[in-house]
């Protein structure tokens, strides 16, 4: 935009005070209740099971919660970052990478091709999607959280399991490390 030949600075968008109050209330009182099923999972370091077995209902619940967490991290940068760091939820989400169901480990359709693959593989995994987003956001504090909880280890384990397969999960793991190289 220009006014009288001068460029106007682009100011960050300020939310409506009502929206701000709602967001504050949500993250203070509701987020813990919403993500309680994720918080009941063991941290990936203490989970002794090689493969996490769950019922279809549990799997669906965790897929939906991971999708919600992904969208919150994507849309509410500051508040979601504070929630993720203060709640210690990332090591529990990493436990889902041990899931038997691939759709629990990985869910990704960030472009048209991925959206098509999502219909071909309707249960693409949701947990890995969160870690990919945190990497792509290129936030040093988020990277520090991933390193603090040693999240790379379960991602490497999952990658080594899928290494010889030519599937969406294997390609996404390769893309994760390619993005890591670029960051």
Q: Model-predicted segments: where are they?
A:
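Extended alpha-helical scaffold regions
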Residues: 1-183
């Amino acid at each position: 935009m220009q006014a009288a030949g001068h460029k106007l600075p682009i100011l960050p968008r300020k939310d409506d005070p009502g929206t701000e109050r709602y967001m504050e209330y949500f993250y203070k009182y509701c987020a813990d209740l919403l993500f309680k099923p994720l918080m009941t999972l063991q941290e990936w370091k203490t989970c002794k099971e090689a493969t996490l077995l769950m019922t279809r209902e549990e799997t669906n619940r965790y897929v939906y919660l991971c999708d919600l967490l992904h969208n919150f991290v994507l849309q509410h940068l500051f508040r979601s970052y504070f929630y993720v760091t203060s709640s210690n939820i990332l090591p529990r989400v990493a436990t889902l990478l041990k899931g038997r169901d691939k759709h629990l480990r990985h869910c990704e359709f960030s472009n048209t091709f991925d959206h098509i693959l999502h219909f071909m593989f309707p249960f693409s995994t949701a947990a890995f999607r969160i870690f990919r987003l945190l990497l792509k956001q290129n936030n040093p504090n988020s990277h520090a959280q991933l390193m603090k909880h040693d999240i790379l280890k379960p991602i490497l384990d999952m990658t080594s399991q899928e290494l010889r397969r030519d599937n969406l999960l294997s390609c996404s793991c390769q893309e994760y490390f390619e993005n890591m190289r670029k960051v």
